[in-house]
């Protein structure tokens, strides 16, 4: 149990940081004045997990104009922290919004806390994803 304490504490901190009901509205960007939200479909992933546990996750950006309407055709860039480049992928790395949304799939190959940075015009924002190794329950 003591070896899992750091991972458990990291999960608790990340859960606490993401408790808000709605994603934080970021921006306005320059020059367009857009605002955007950043969310992750599954902030906790598992390596070597059975079929029901998530092994990859969608990183989702929603862009809106000053009136709150979704904006199409806005370039969004998704970047993995340099320390994760050899151990994970994010596809695509650039996307244009459709119906105000752009998404990329993050797929890790190792455990740890991965950071993804999203750029919309001049505004960048980070999110963290926790990747754990799956250990099947042991019989007693």
What annotation goes with each model-predicted range?
Residues 18-140:
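The feature marks long extracellular or luminal low-complexity segments
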């Amino acid at each position: 149990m003591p070896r899992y304490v750091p991972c458990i504490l990291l999960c608790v901190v990340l859960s606490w940081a993401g408790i808000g009901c709605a994603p934080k509205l970021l921006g306005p960007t320059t020059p367009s004045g857009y605002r955007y939200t950043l969310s992750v479909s599954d902030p906790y992933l598992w390596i070597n997990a059975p079929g029901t546990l998530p092994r990859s996750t969608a990183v989702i950006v929603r862009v809106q104009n000053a009136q709150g309407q979704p904006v199409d055709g806005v370039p969004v860039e998704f970047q993995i922290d340099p320390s994760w480049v050899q151990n994970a992928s994010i596809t695509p790395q650039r996307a244009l919004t459709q119906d105000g949304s752009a998404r990329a799939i993050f797929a890790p190959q190792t455990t740890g806390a991965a950071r993804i940075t999203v750029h919309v015009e001049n505004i960048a924002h980070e999110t963290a994803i926790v990747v754990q190794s799956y250990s099947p329950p042991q019989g007693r």
